[in-house]
């Protein structure tokens, strides 16, 4: 059975173009979402994925209607393949029921993996370069060591953690982490 999925990014956009194309392609059922592709919560996609069974074909108007990213798209199509479900994108002329369509997705998978590895490599190189210049990754600490020592002295002098937290605008739980209860009486 051919089952379609349409998605538009906003409620103001119309699904008619995609829906007509899927109906012309022979889709018996069509599920839809009106949400950004970056959103993970897409109820229409969840429903169509539950509905599909071995031998079915998931049909979309265009690749970007299905996946949030190349990596997400490749993972999704691999999951479909593992379940014995084919995938077809009408405007991109991709059909995983054909040898050429399967080959195309193998290439896409390799490209997505390479992209992920390049991102990891660039991130590591950037962090290494920053460390070599004496910079440490992450945001700057909210308090300098001197401020933490002031907090410690207040706690040592019996000031309750709650008061210290209010004075320095820090969570009481942070004070417990930084200065364990066994260290002080408060």
Swiss-Prot record:
GO BP, sorted A to Z: DNA integration; symbiont entry into host cell; viral tropism switching
Catalytic residues (positions): 9
Keywords: DNA integration, DNA invertase, DNA recombination, DNA-binding, Viral receptor tropism switching, Virus entry into host cell
Signal peptide: none
Molecular-function GO terms, alphabetical: DNA binding; DNA strand exchange activity
Record SUPFAM superfamilies: Homeodomain-like (SSF46689), Resolvase-like (SSF53041)
Keyword field contains DNA-binding: yes
Family assignment from sequence similarity: Belongs to the site-specific recombinase resolvase family.
Name this polypeptide is given: DNA-invertase
Species whose genome carries this gene: Enterobacteria phage P7
